Amino acid sequence: MRLLKKLFLILLFFRFAYVFACDLPGHFDFDVSNSIDEEILYSGCYDTVNLGPHIIEYILTKERAEARGVKRPSASFTQDRDGGVLQSLLAENGYSLPHHRDYTRSGYDRGHMAPNGDFNDTYENALATFFIANIWPQTPNVNRVEWLRTENKTRTLASEYLFVKVIIIVDEFTEERVGNIQVPLCFKRRVYDLYTGELIYEIDVYQLMEPEESDTL
């Protein structure tokens, strides 16, 4: 009975804890699901002005946080990891998604917001994070050190709390661009205990330096 109550509260929090800001002009929401059981892996609000996700949110479980059996997919970031739904929606409204190649030799990494490391329970789930609407330009230091540190902290919290809700917000930008993609100034991570709704981790990661030498291909 206690477990059922906890699961009910988790689902209730998942339903009402956050409302996307996709009523903003030029913003569109999307979901990326597992094609086998149709589980929503992560959701987002896509910003067509700056060409990346304004918000990404998902639930991270202890099981997924501790999964180690899947090798990182060697894959390009495509426009159709959601089955092409967002791409079609944008096209209907006169917008389009960037391409994997837009980042090539830019000096910036393709930085996951929902990282493949949080979905390592199956290869398909990890691959689903390689969605062009799930990334922003990040300097190599931010992507591989500072932001990675926040991802590792989040996985530690998921192991401790069993279920956490992760919200990534990107709403501040530099004047730099990668092609037409605006380079973010700050990446904001908020992690909540699903059982209590308590904010248990909050961090803003700024990238103020010029991009370093990157092997982005």
Locations of regions flagged by a protein language model:
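Signature of the chorismate-utilizing enzyme
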Residues: 11, 64-65, 189
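Generic detection of long, well-ordered alpha-helical segments
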Residues: 34-35, 46-47, 53-56, 65-67, ...
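Short, His- and charge-rich active-site/binding loops that engage polyanionic ligands
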Residues: 39-109
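Extreme N-terminus nucleophile/cap motif
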Residues: 20-43
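Domain-level detector of nuclease and nuclease-like folds
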Residues: 85, 92-217
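Classical Sec-dependent N-terminal signal peptides that target proteins to the secretory pathway
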Residues: 2-21
